[in-house]
């Protein structure tokens, strides 16, 4: 890509756990979407959640003749329970929360824009600028600090839920800073930040030692990227006892960089969670990731970013742009033409290719929407064709 990377420059990404207030909101939104898709694969869903103190407000729009078949309030309580908020001392308690259902119906104007009368095609559910990205930092084609930041929190979550570290509580964040060489290769970790909610009786010394030795170090498989100069900031604010929605209000769609590529790629601003696949903010972002990942895996570029733009009610994207550090304009045009001619970028085409009418969304929304190989947009089934047509 057209980035200037100085030798020994540091790049940083952050992640949040499933117990972070914004992530609680995302999970409730996507759990509601999944439950709707189980009873109506064509349901139109735009679900937003705000969570503060011991109150959950569920808003947005759902269009389905069987909307009343799901219990939105019970879905929210079950998500909060599964995360581990089982005691008000943790900042939230599924047993005592108040849940307000303020979900309405989707606008008839929007429905008419998406579903054209007498046509089987779908228009885009909204306008939007969407980006997909991949790089060769890791085997999952994600930025190294971003992948590590998420892996650290996943490890912590597993140890918390298994009871191996009983004093951990659900809310946490991480941040990883890596040093890159002049060829944009990650060479070592400069700094790791972990802020993790905890029981009030745990000492800072024990917390630091446990998080470094039992969570961080076992997570990092390549020990060569750690050295004596790596610094650790473990709960740098001091105590982190007051957490969850008691400490910070949560809102759907507020962690768009942690959801995508950790700041390594551009972002159009549209969040993913709570939206069915007619909303191109989500579905086209998954498709753009699929294309970018296959391009990098095919050896076209070390990193690849694809921009798509849509207009509401219009089937095809109104613009397509690639950014891949390719200095040959003719070759760049060839790549762009290949994308246009080989990938169906309409909402219908994306939904069919990526199987987006399935109730898969709750699994997508924690620890990043990308890099999870169970999903269709992570498959590398286009690599051979790309290499045959485009590889120099």
Swiss-Prot record:
Binding note for cofactor: Binds 2 divalent ions per subunit. Binds 1 potassium ion per subunit.
Pfam families: S-AdoMet_synt_C, S-AdoMet_synt_M, S-AdoMet_synt_N
Catalytic activity: L-methionine + ATP + H2O = S-adenosyl-L-methionine + phosphate + diphosphate
Protein name, as recorded: S-adenosylmethionine synthase
Cofactor: Mg(2+); K(+)
Classification lineage: Bacteria, Pseudomonadati, Spirochaetota, Spirochaetia, Spirochaetales
The organism of origin for this protein: Borreliella afzelii (strain PKo) (Borrelia afzelii)
Domain of life from the UniProt record: Bacteria
The enzyme's E.C. designation: 2.5.1.6
Annotated positions binding ATP: 20, 171-173, 248, 254-255, 271, 275
Described purpose of this protein according to its UniProt entry: Catalyzes the formation of S-adenosylmethionine (AdoMet) from methionine and ATP. The overall synthetic reaction is composed of two sequential steps, AdoMet formation and the subsequent tripolyphosphate hydrolysis which occurs prior to release of AdoMet from the enzyme.
UniProt cross-references to SUPFAM superfamilies, sorted A to Z: S-adenosylmethionine synthetase
Family that this chain belongs to: Belongs to the AdoMet synthase family.
GO biological process: one-carbon metabolic process; S-adenosylmethionine biosynthetic process
Subunit structure: Homotetramer; dimer of dimers.
């Amino acid at each position: 890509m057209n980035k200037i990377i100085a030798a020994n420059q540091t790049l940083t990404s952050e992640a949040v756990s499933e117990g972070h207030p914004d992530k609680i909101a995302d999970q409730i939104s996507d759990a509601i979407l999944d439950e709707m898709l189980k009873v109506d694969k064509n349901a139109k869903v735009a679900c937003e959640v705000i969570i503060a103190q011991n109150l959950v407000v569920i808003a947005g729009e759902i269009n389905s003749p069987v909307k009343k078949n799901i219990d939105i309030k019970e879905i929210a309580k079950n998500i909060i329970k599964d995360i581990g908020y089982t005691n008000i001392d943790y900042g939230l308690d599924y047993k005592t929360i108040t849940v307000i259902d303020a979900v309405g119906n989707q606008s008839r104007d929007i429905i008419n824009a998406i579903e054209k009368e007498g046509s089987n095609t779908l228009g885009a559910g909204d306008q939007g600028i969407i980006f997909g990205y991949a790089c060769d930092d890791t085997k999952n084609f994600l930025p190294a600090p971003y992948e590590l930041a998420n892996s650290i929190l996943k490890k912590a979550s597993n140890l918390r839920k298994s009871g191996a570290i009983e004093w951990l509580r659900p809310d946490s964040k991480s941040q990883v800073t890596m040093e890159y060489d002049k060829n944009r290769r990650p060479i070592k970790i400069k700094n790791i930040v972990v802020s993790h909610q905890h029981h009030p009786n745990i000492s800072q010394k024990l917390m630091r030692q446990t998080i470094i030795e039992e969570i961080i170090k076992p997570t990092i498989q390549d020990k060569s990227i750690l050295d004596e100069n790596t610094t650790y900031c473990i709960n740098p604010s001091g105590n982190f006892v007051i957490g969850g929605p008691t400490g910070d209000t949560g809102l759907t769609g507020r962690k768009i960089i942690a959801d995508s590529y950790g700041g390594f790629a551009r972002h159009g601003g549209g969040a993913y969670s709570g939206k069915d696949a007619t909303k191109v903010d989500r579905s086209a972002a998954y498709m753009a990731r699929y294309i970018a990942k296959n391009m990098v895996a095919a050896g076209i570029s070390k990193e690849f970013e694809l921009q798509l733009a849509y207009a509401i009610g219009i089937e095809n994207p109104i613009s397509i742009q690639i950014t891949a550090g390719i200095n040959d304009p003719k070759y760049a045009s060839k790549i762009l033409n290949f994308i246009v001619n080989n990938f169906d970028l309409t909402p219908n085409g994306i939904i069919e290719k990526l199987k987006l009418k399935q109730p898969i969304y709750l699994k997508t929304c924690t620890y990043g929407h990308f890099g999870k190989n169970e999903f269709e947009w992570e498959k590398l089934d286009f690599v051979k064709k790309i290499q045959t047509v485009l590889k120099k």
